[in-house]
């Protein structure tokens, strides 16, 4: 099968019926041609590229972002945010991916799509491009941005406006939105001040437009007045 893909286009393969024995792997081969093809290396699925010397382990090419199965009457839950949302560094040198753990606990009545992306920013998602369009396919969307926006020295107003707009775009698409506070990240100086200012706005203003609000620091932050610091180190997934 061959398909020409336009810039920014999202495409899906045709449905196929497969029977995979327990403890076996599904392998498939895809050929891309063109120039400046975007990709993200943040995946743990084994991936290989083929050249004149044979197959070699390689993540620097486009890979399927979603492999789904049809489940009747399941609620679709989406997580969008950065690497904290994605579930990297859950404990030292360990990637546990919260969406996968929740899927195991909640069973077949729920399906999860982990759209957390390393170094993700609110200003990326607010462009309403392919990333946010994927999130709009969910019934419930958890939104957690801010750490990378602050680390990139963006203004408090810019971060707050972008987050508020993201909530609006998702709600307009018919999604229920659960807004998360900016997680603790051991920030200092001006970044620390921005962390408190952004979280105050999210808690007191943006949360009123969402269907729920979860303050991450209640679970993984240190006691006040050090709520901006994580109990589990600088990448606070623990």
Task: State each model region's role.
Residues 103, 171, 203-207:
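Class I S-adenosyl-L-methionine
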Residues 183-238:
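Catalytic His-Asp segment of secreted/periplasmic serine-dependent ester chemistry enzymes
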Residues 30, 145, 181-182:
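A cross-domain feature marking catalytic cores of carbohydrate-active enzymes
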Residues 80-82, 180, 214:
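Active-site flanking residues adjacent to catalytic metal/cofactor-binding acidic residues
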Residues 111, 176-178, 212:
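Proline-centered loop/turn at the N-terminus of a beta-strand
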Residues 1-80, 85-92, 108, 136-137, ...:
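N-terminal secretory targeting modules
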Residues 11, 15, 73-168, 186-200, ...:
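Conserved SGNH/GDSL esterase-like catalytic core that processes O-acyl groups on lipids
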Residues 114-116, 181, 215:
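Residue-level recognition of beta-strand->loop/alpha-helix junctions
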